[in-house]
Protein backbone atom coordinates (compact mmCIF):
# COMPACT_ATOMS: atom_id res chain seq x y z
CA UNK A 1 0.00 0.00 0.00
CA UNK A 2 2.67 2.51 1.02
CA UNK A 3 4.66 1.95 -2.17
CA UNK A 4 1.56 2.60 -4.28
CA UNK A 5 0.88 5.76 -2.28
CA UNK A 6 4.40 7.07 -2.73
CA UNK A 7 4.50 6.28 -6.45
CA UNK A 8 1.12 7.84 -7.20
CA UNK A 9 1.75 10.94 -5.08
CA UNK A 10 5.10 11.46 -6.80
CA UNK A 11 3.56 11.01 -10.25
CA UNK A 12 1.02 13.73 -9.51
CA UNK A 13 3.52 16.13 -7.89
CA UNK A 14 5.82 15.80 -10.90
CA UNK A 15 3.15 17.37 -13.11
CA UNK A 16 3.60 21.18 -12.79
CA UNK A 17 -0.15 21.74 -12.81
CA UNK A 18 -0.30 25.42 -11.92
CA UNK A 19 -3.95 26.47 -11.99
CA UNK A 20 -5.86 25.94 -14.24
CA UNK A 21 -3.41 23.73 -16.16
CA UNK A 22 -4.00 20.07 -15.33
CA UNK A 23 -0.73 19.11 -17.02
CA UNK A 24 -1.46 15.37 -17.40
CA UNK A 25 -2.61 14.74 -13.81
CA UNK A 26 -6.08 13.65 -14.85
CA UNK A 27 -4.68 11.17 -17.38
CA UNK A 28 -2.78 9.54 -14.52
CA UNK A 29 -5.98 9.48 -12.46
CA UNK A 30 -8.26 8.24 -15.24
CA UNK A 31 -5.83 5.47 -16.20
CA UNK A 32 -5.83 4.37 -12.56
CA UNK A 33 -9.63 4.44 -12.33
CA UNK A 34 -10.10 2.69 -15.68
CA UNK A 35 -8.05 -0.21 -14.34
CA UNK A 36 -10.69 -0.47 -11.59
CA UNK A 37 -13.57 -0.53 -14.11
CA UNK A 38 -14.74 3.03 -13.51
CA UNK A 39 -16.84 4.86 -16.07
CA UNK A 40 -14.97 8.05 -17.01
CA UNK A 41 -16.73 11.12 -18.33
CA UNK A 42 -14.60 14.17 -19.24
CA UNK A 43 -16.41 17.46 -18.54
CA UNK A 44 -13.82 19.97 -19.70
CA UNK A 45 -14.82 23.63 -19.80
CA UNK A 46 -12.82 26.48 -21.33
CA UNK A 47 -9.19 26.01 -20.18
CA UNK A 48 -10.17 23.68 -17.32
CA UNK A 49 -9.91 19.89 -17.21
CA UNK A 50 -12.71 18.10 -15.34
CA UNK A 51 -13.75 14.50 -14.88
CA UNK A 52 -16.78 12.74 -13.44
CA UNK A 53 -16.01 9.08 -12.76
CA UNK A 54 -18.13 6.40 -11.15
CA UNK A 55 -18.33 2.68 -10.51
CA UNK A 56 -21.61 0.98 -9.71
CA UNK A 57 -22.00 -1.73 -7.12
CA UNK A 58 -23.99 -4.88 -7.76
CA UNK A 59 -27.31 -3.01 -7.56
CA UNK A 60 -27.48 -0.40 -10.33
CA UNK A 61 -31.07 0.61 -9.57
CA UNK A 62 -31.06 1.24 -5.85
CA UNK A 63 -27.80 2.51 -4.43
CA UNK A 64 -26.11 5.11 -2.25
CA UNK A 65 -23.37 7.26 -3.80
CA UNK A 66 -20.16 8.14 -1.97
CA UNK A 67 -18.33 10.92 -3.80
CA UNK A 68 -14.65 11.77 -3.47
CA UNK A 69 -13.92 15.31 -4.68
CA UNK A 70 -10.59 16.97 -5.32
CA UNK A 71 -8.45 19.17 -7.51
CA UNK A 72 -5.27 18.63 -9.49
CA UNK A 73 -4.27 22.29 -9.82
CA UNK A 74 -1.76 23.93 -7.50
CA UNK A 75 -0.64 27.45 -6.71
CA UNK A 76 2.70 28.67 -8.15
CA UNK A 77 5.80 27.57 -6.21
CA UNK A 78 7.30 31.05 -5.98
CA UNK A 79 11.07 31.37 -6.09
CA UNK A 80 12.24 27.79 -6.65
CA UNK A 81 15.67 28.64 -5.23
CA UNK A 82 14.05 28.91 -1.79
CA UNK A 83 12.95 25.27 -1.92
CA UNK A 84 15.01 22.57 -0.23
CA UNK A 85 14.17 20.30 -3.17
CA UNK A 86 12.75 21.20 -6.60
CA UNK A 87 9.02 21.89 -6.10
CA UNK A 88 7.89 19.45 -8.78
CA UNK A 89 10.35 16.64 -7.99
CA UNK A 90 8.36 14.72 -5.38
CA UNK A 91 11.57 14.11 -3.44
CA UNK A 92 11.31 11.73 -0.47
CA UNK A 93 13.62 12.54 2.45
CA UNK A 94 13.33 11.18 5.99
CA UNK A 95 9.92 9.67 5.15
CA UNK A 96 8.53 12.99 3.95
CA UNK A 97 7.46 13.77 0.37
CA UNK A 98 8.29 17.32 -0.69
CA UNK A 99 6.63 19.18 -3.52
CA UNK A 100 4.02 21.72 -4.52
CA UNK A 101 0.62 20.13 -4.05
CA UNK A 102 1.84 17.34 -1.77
CA UNK A 103 -0.58 18.36 0.98
CA UNK A 104 -2.94 20.51 -1.11
CA UNK A 105 -4.07 18.14 -2.42
CA UNK A 106 -2.26 15.58 -4.54
CA UNK A 107 -1.39 13.47 -1.51
CA UNK A 108 -5.07 13.23 -0.61
CA UNK A 109 -5.97 12.35 -4.21
CA UNK A 110 -3.44 9.52 -4.14
CA UNK A 111 -4.80 8.38 -0.76
CA UNK A 112 -8.36 8.31 -2.16
CA UNK A 113 -7.32 6.34 -5.23
CA UNK A 114 -5.22 3.77 -3.37
CA UNK A 115 -7.98 3.33 -0.77
CA UNK A 116 -10.48 2.78 -3.59
CA UNK A 117 -8.26 0.14 -5.20
CA UNK A 118 -7.80 -1.64 -1.86
CA UNK A 119 -11.54 -1.56 -1.22
CA UNK A 120 -12.48 -2.95 -4.64
CA UNK A 121 -9.86 -5.69 -4.37
CA UNK A 122 -11.27 -6.74 -1.00
CA UNK A 123 -14.94 -6.19 -1.86
CA UNK A 124 -15.33 -6.59 -5.64
CA UNK A 125 -19.09 -7.09 -5.22
CA UNK A 126 -19.79 -4.01 -3.11
CA UNK A 127 -23.37 -2.75 -3.06
CA UNK A 128 -23.19 1.02 -3.51
CA UNK A 129 -21.68 3.46 -6.01
CA UNK A 130 -18.25 5.10 -5.74
CA UNK A 131 -17.74 8.38 -7.61
CA UNK A 132 -15.02 10.98 -8.21
CA UNK A 133 -15.14 14.63 -9.21
CA UNK A 134 -11.72 16.00 -10.19
CA UNK A 135 -11.05 19.51 -11.49
CA UNK A 136 -8.04 21.64 -12.43
CA UNK A 137 -9.79 24.90 -11.44
CA UNK A 138 -10.03 25.13 -7.66
CA UNK A 139 -7.08 27.30 -6.70
CA UNK A 140 -8.05 29.84 -9.38
CA UNK A 141 -11.43 31.31 -10.26
CA UNK A 142 -13.42 28.11 -9.78
CA UNK A 143 -15.74 29.21 -12.58
CA UNK A 144 -15.09 26.29 -14.94
CA UNK A 145 -14.41 23.53 -12.44
CA UNK A 146 -16.60 21.73 -9.91
CA UNK A 147 -19.26 24.39 -10.38
CA UNK A 148 -19.73 23.29 -14.01
CA UNK A 149 -19.68 19.59 -13.16
CA UNK A 150 -22.31 19.94 -10.44
CA UNK A 151 -24.55 21.98 -12.70
CA UNK A 152 -24.49 19.16 -15.27
CA UNK A 153 -25.04 16.44 -12.68
CA UNK A 154 -28.02 18.23 -11.16
CA UNK A 155 -29.51 18.80 -14.60
CA UNK A 156 -29.53 15.06 -15.27
CA UNK A 157 -30.71 14.17 -11.75
CA UNK A 158 -27.57 12.41 -10.53
CA UNK A 159 -27.99 11.62 -6.84
CA UNK A 160 -25.09 12.05 -4.40
CA UNK A 161 -25.57 11.05 -0.76
CA UNK A 162 -22.18 11.59 0.84
CA UNK A 163 -19.11 13.56 -0.20
CA UNK A 164 -15.55 13.63 1.08
CA UNK A 165 -13.40 16.53 -0.11
CA UNK A 166 -9.67 15.98 0.30
CA UNK A 167 -8.81 19.53 1.36
CA UNK A 168 -6.02 19.73 3.98
CA UNK A 169 -8.23 20.01 7.07
CA UNK A 170 -5.90 18.60 9.73
CA UNK A 171 -3.92 20.86 12.07
CA UNK A 172 -1.49 18.76 14.11
CA UNK A 173 -2.48 15.14 13.44
CA UNK A 174 -4.39 13.50 10.61
CA UNK A 175 -8.07 13.65 11.46
CA UNK A 176 -7.84 16.07 14.38
CA UNK A 177 -10.02 18.55 12.44
CA UNK A 178 -12.75 17.85 9.91
CA UNK A 179 -14.73 20.61 8.24
CA UNK A 180 -18.41 20.70 7.38
CA UNK A 181 -18.66 24.23 6.01
CA UNK A 182 -16.79 27.36 4.99
CA UNK A 183 -17.44 31.08 5.08
CA UNK A 184 -18.27 32.93 1.89
CA UNK A 185 -15.85 35.25 0.15
CA UNK A 186 -16.20 38.51 -1.74
CA UNK A 187 -13.49 40.69 -3.21
CA UNK A 188 -13.70 44.37 -4.01
CA UNK A 189 -11.66 47.27 -5.35
CA UNK A 190 -12.10 50.79 -3.99
CA UNK A 191 -10.71 53.76 -5.91
CA UNK A 192 -10.53 57.02 -3.93
CA UNK A 193 -10.12 60.11 -6.09
CA UNK A 194 -8.08 63.09 -4.96
CA UNK A 195 -6.20 65.81 -6.77
CA UNK A 196 -2.49 65.82 -7.51
CA UNK A 197 -0.43 68.68 -6.18
CA UNK A 198 2.74 69.96 -4.54
CA UNK A 199 3.16 68.79 -0.96
CA UNK A 200 4.10 72.33 0.15
CA UNK A 201 0.66 73.63 -0.87
CA UNK A 202 -1.88 71.40 0.88
CA UNK A 203 -4.59 74.01 0.38
CA UNK A 204 -4.53 73.30 -3.36
CA UNK A 205 -4.71 69.50 -3.29
CA UNK A 206 -6.68 66.53 -2.02
CA UNK A 207 -4.38 63.74 -0.95
CA UNK A 208 -6.26 60.45 -1.48
CA UNK A 209 -3.95 58.69 0.98
CA UNK A 210 -5.00 61.06 3.74
CA UNK A 211 -8.63 60.70 2.71
CA UNK A 212 -8.33 56.92 2.94
CA UNK A 213 -6.83 56.69 6.44
CA UNK A 214 -10.04 57.29 8.47
CA UNK A 215 -11.99 55.11 6.02
CA UNK A 216 -9.52 52.27 6.49
CA UNK A 217 -9.73 52.64 10.25
CA UNK A 218 -13.51 52.45 10.12
CA UNK A 219 -13.52 49.42 7.81
CA UNK A 220 -11.10 47.51 10.03
CA UNK A 221 -13.02 48.27 13.22
CA UNK A 222 -16.57 47.63 12.02
CA UNK A 223 -18.60 44.69 13.35
CA UNK A 224 -20.20 43.38 10.18
CA UNK A 225 -22.55 40.74 11.57
CA UNK A 226 -25.92 41.64 13.04
CA UNK A 227 -25.76 38.62 15.36
CA UNK A 228 -23.10 36.17 16.50
CA UNK A 229 -22.99 33.11 14.25
CA UNK A 230 -23.23 29.72 15.92
CA UNK A 231 -21.87 27.96 12.83
CA UNK A 232 -18.99 30.10 11.54
CA UNK A 233 -16.22 32.49 12.66
CA UNK A 234 -17.05 36.21 12.53
CA UNK A 235 -17.17 38.06 9.24
CA UNK A 236 -13.82 39.74 8.63
CA UNK A 237 -12.12 42.05 6.14
CA UNK A 238 -8.50 42.05 5.01
CA UNK A 239 -6.79 44.68 2.87
CA UNK A 240 -4.83 42.83 0.19
CA UNK A 241 -3.30 45.57 -2.01
CA UNK A 242 -2.76 49.30 -1.69
CA UNK A 243 -1.21 51.55 -4.32
CA UNK A 244 -1.46 55.02 -5.81
CA UNK A 245 -1.80 56.46 -9.30
CA UNK A 246 0.43 57.81 -10.66
CA UNK A 247 3.23 55.85 -9.05
CA UNK A 248 6.16 58.24 -8.87
CA UNK A 249 9.21 57.00 -7.01
CA UNK A 250 11.58 59.63 -8.43
CA UNK A 251 10.33 62.47 -6.24
CA UNK A 252 8.70 62.88 -2.86
CA UNK A 253 7.15 66.32 -3.30
CA UNK A 254 4.01 65.36 -5.22
CA UNK A 255 0.78 63.77 -4.04
CA UNK A 256 -1.05 61.11 -6.08
CA UNK A 257 -4.26 61.51 -8.01
CA UNK A 258 -5.86 58.26 -6.86
CA UNK A 259 -5.51 55.59 -4.22
CA UNK A 260 -6.56 52.05 -5.15
CA UNK A 261 -7.40 49.66 -2.36
CA UNK A 262 -8.18 45.95 -2.85
CA UNK A 263 -9.89 44.04 -0.08
CA UNK A 264 -11.49 40.70 0.69
CA UNK A 265 -14.35 39.76 3.00
CA UNK A 266 -14.88 36.34 4.52
CA UNK A 267 -18.49 36.32 5.64
CA UNK A 268 -20.73 33.98 7.59
CA UNK A 269 -24.45 33.22 7.66
CA UNK A 270 -25.19 36.42 9.59
CA UNK A 271 -24.02 38.62 6.71
CA UNK A 272 -24.86 38.62 3.01
CA UNK A 273 -23.31 40.13 -0.07
CA UNK A 274 -26.15 42.66 -0.03
CA UNK A 275 -25.61 43.68 3.60
CA UNK A 276 -21.84 44.03 3.08
CA UNK A 277 -22.36 46.19 -0.02
CA UNK A 278 -24.82 48.41 1.84
CA UNK A 279 -22.58 48.81 4.88
CA UNK A 280 -19.55 49.70 2.76
CA UNK A 281 -21.53 52.36 0.89
CA UNK A 282 -22.90 53.80 4.15
CA UNK A 283 -19.40 54.08 5.58
CA UNK A 284 -18.06 55.77 2.45
CA UNK A 285 -20.97 58.24 2.34
CA UNK A 286 -19.97 59.57 5.78
CA UNK A 287 -16.56 60.74 4.55
CA UNK A 288 -17.61 62.90 1.59
CA UNK A 289 -15.04 61.46 -0.80
CA UNK A 290 -15.28 60.83 -4.52
CA UNK A 291 -14.89 57.12 -5.10
CA UNK A 292 -15.64 54.17 -7.33
CA UNK A 293 -16.38 50.75 -5.84
CA UNK A 294 -16.15 47.59 -7.92
CA UNK A 295 -16.98 44.07 -6.72
CA UNK A 296 -14.86 41.48 -8.49
CA UNK A 297 -15.70 38.00 -7.23
CA UNK A 298 -17.90 36.24 -4.73
CA UNK A 299 -18.79 32.87 -3.25
CA UNK A 300 -21.51 32.08 -0.75
CA UNK A 301 -20.93 30.33 2.59
CA UNK A 302 -21.97 26.73 2.89
CA UNK A 303 -22.80 24.49 5.84
CA UNK A 304 -23.46 20.75 5.84
CA UNK A 305 -25.44 19.57 8.85
CA UNK A 306 -23.63 16.74 10.69
CA UNK A 307 -25.20 13.36 9.99
CA UNK A 308 -24.27 9.76 9.31
CA UNK A 309 -21.00 10.57 7.53
CA UNK A 310 -19.71 12.75 10.36
CA UNK A 311 -20.56 10.08 12.93
CA UNK A 312 -18.81 7.39 10.88
CA UNK A 313 -15.65 9.46 10.50
CA UNK A 314 -15.52 10.43 14.17
CA UNK A 315 -15.93 6.79 15.23
CA UNK A 316 -13.17 5.62 12.83
CA UNK A 317 -10.66 8.25 13.93
CA UNK A 318 -11.41 7.62 17.61
CA UNK A 319 -11.09 3.85 17.21
CA UNK A 320 -7.91 3.68 15.14
CA UNK A 321 -6.07 6.89 16.05
CA UNK A 322 -7.32 7.74 19.54
CA UNK A 323 -8.28 11.26 18.46
CA UNK A 324 -11.63 13.00 18.84
CA UNK A 325 -11.93 15.16 15.72
CA UNK A 326 -12.95 18.77 16.05
CA UNK A 327 -15.73 19.78 13.67
CA UNK A 328 -15.41 23.36 12.40
CA UNK A 329 -15.90 25.75 9.49
CA UNK A 330 -12.66 27.75 9.53
CA UNK A 331 -10.32 28.35 6.61
CA UNK A 332 -10.68 29.48 3.03
CA UNK A 333 -13.33 28.64 0.48
CA UNK A 334 -13.65 25.17 -1.01
CA UNK A 335 -15.64 23.43 -3.73
CA UNK A 336 -18.03 22.26 -1.05
CA UNK A 337 -19.97 25.44 -1.82
CA UNK A 338 -20.93 23.92 -5.17
CA UNK A 339 -21.41 20.31 -4.07
CA UNK A 340 -23.82 21.35 -1.29
CA UNK A 341 -26.39 22.03 -4.04
CA UNK A 342 -26.75 18.26 -4.54
CA UNK A 343 -28.08 17.78 -1.01
CA UNK A 344 -25.17 15.52 -0.08
CA UNK A 345 -23.69 15.45 3.40
CA UNK A 346 -20.20 16.92 2.98
CA UNK A 347 -17.04 16.54 4.99
CA UNK A 348 -13.60 17.95 4.24
CA UNK A 349 -10.90 15.60 5.47
CA UNK A 350 -7.31 15.69 4.32
CA UNK A 351 -3.65 16.28 5.08
CA UNK A 352 -2.04 18.66 7.56
CA UNK A 353 -2.36 22.29 6.49
CA UNK A 354 0.80 23.70 8.09
CA UNK A 355 2.81 23.80 4.82
CA UNK A 356 0.12 24.44 2.20
CA UNK A 357 0.94 27.19 -0.33
CA UNK A 358 4.36 27.56 1.35
CA UNK A 359 7.92 26.93 0.27
CA UNK A 360 8.85 23.30 1.04
CA UNK A 361 5.24 22.08 1.09
CA UNK A 362 5.31 18.44 2.19
CA UNK A 363 3.43 15.45 3.58
CA UNK A 364 4.64 12.76 5.97
CA UNK A 365 4.40 9.19 4.64
CA UNK A 366 2.82 8.06 7.91
CA UNK A 367 0.13 10.71 7.49
CA UNK A 368 -0.42 9.69 3.88
CA UNK A 369 -0.93 6.07 4.91
CA UNK A 370 -3.26 7.07 7.77
CA UNK A 371 -5.36 9.22 5.46
CA UNK A 372 -5.76 6.41 2.94
CA UNK A 373 -6.67 4.01 5.75
CA UNK A 374 -9.38 6.37 7.01
CA UNK A 375 -10.84 6.70 3.51
CA UNK A 376 -10.84 2.89 3.19
CA UNK A 377 -12.69 2.45 6.48
CA UNK A 378 -15.28 5.06 5.46
CA UNK A 379 -15.94 3.08 2.28
CA UNK A 380 -16.44 -0.08 4.32
CA UNK A 381 -19.12 1.66 6.38
CA UNK A 382 -21.01 3.23 3.46
CA UNK A 383 -20.52 1.08 0.38
CA UNK A 384 -21.20 -2.44 1.70
From Swiss-Prot:
A Pfam family of this chain: M20_dimer
Needed cofactors: Zn(2+); Co(2+)
For Zn(2+) 1, which residues are the binding ones? 71, 104, 167
Residues noted as binding Zn(2+) 2 in the record, renumbered to the chain:
104, 139, 357
- Superkingdom field: Bacteria
Listed under catalytic activity are: N-succinyl-(2S,6S)-2,6-diaminopimelate + H2O = (2S,6S)-2,6-diaminopimelate + succinate
Give GO BP annotations, semicolon-separated.
diaminopimelate biosynthetic process; L-arginine biosynthetic process; lysine biosynthetic process via diaminopimelate
Q: Which SUPFAM superfamilies match?
A: Bacterial exopeptidase dimerisation domain, Zn-dependent exopeptidases
Which family is annotated? Answer: Belongs to the peptidase M20A family. DapE subfamily.
HAMAP family for the chain: DapE
Description of how the protein assembles with itself and partners: Homodimer.
The protein's role, per its UniProt record = Catalyzes the hydrolysis of N-succinyl-L,L-diaminopimelic acid (SDAP), forming succinate and LL-2,6-diaminopimelate (DAP), an intermediate involved in the bacterial biosynthesis of lysine and meso-diaminopimelic acid, an essential component of bacterial cell walls.
Q: What is this protein called?
A: Succinyl-diaminopimelate desuccinylase
Organism whose genome encodes this protein: Blochmanniella floridana
Gene from which the chain derives: dapE
Amino acid sequence: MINDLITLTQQLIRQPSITPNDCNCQKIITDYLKSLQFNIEPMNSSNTSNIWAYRYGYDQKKYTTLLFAGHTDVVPPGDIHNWQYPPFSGTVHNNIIYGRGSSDMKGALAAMLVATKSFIQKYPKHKNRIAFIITSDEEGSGIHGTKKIIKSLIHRHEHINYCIIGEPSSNNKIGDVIKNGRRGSCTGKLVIHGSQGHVAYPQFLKNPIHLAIPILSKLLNTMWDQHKSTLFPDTSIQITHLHTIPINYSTNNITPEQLILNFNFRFNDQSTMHSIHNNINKILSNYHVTYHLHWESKSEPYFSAPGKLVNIIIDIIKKYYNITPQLNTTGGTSDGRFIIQTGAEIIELGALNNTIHKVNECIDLVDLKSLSHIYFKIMEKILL
